[in-house]
Amino acid sequence: MIKLKSPQDIEGLKVCGALSKEALRLTGEMVRPGISTWELDKFCEDFIRMHGGVPGFKGYGGFPGTICASINDEVVHGIPSRDRILCEGDIISIDTGATVNGWVGDNAWTFAVGHISDDRKALLEVTRDCLALAIEQAVPGNHLGDIGYAVQSHAQKHGYGVIREYVGHGIGRKMHEEPNVPNYGHRGFGIKLEIGMV
């Protein structure tokens, strides 16, 4: 069941979202050749705790880290480790979130490690544009399929596919709330988006 959020709820989500965003941004600034994903994880956890939050991922479903650190072709949920050292030319997707006052934040971004190939730059540009197009579709009155269609059609137009096994999701008091938000779909299909959906 989709839980619509009140304006007060959304203010609570903005607080945890702001902390999650800043934790991700600063962790991303540390990305460089030679750093371990464990060091990134440690920094992110310390930052979240220092600013009154609790790492949202640590212990969630048994996950051991504060960040998911997925390198190159690893799709998602990469486990941070002292042995996973970033190399020049890698790309790393960092996914993290903070819980503040019972509200959960969750965000991810893919960072370049030093200089990356033109192919990897193109991938990052297309996925960034897919995100922007998806956000444009996330308005009351549109359908869930409009979001997925925007992502899928733009990716395919540029020669990429989408991962069907993992989806975006609602968020609130729990990390994963309804609805699931696939990166594929058809215009005008699926649930109608309403004010208060997050």
Residue ranges of each PLM-predicted region?
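Active-site neighborhoods and metal-handling regions in enzymes and metal-associated proteins
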Residues: 1-198
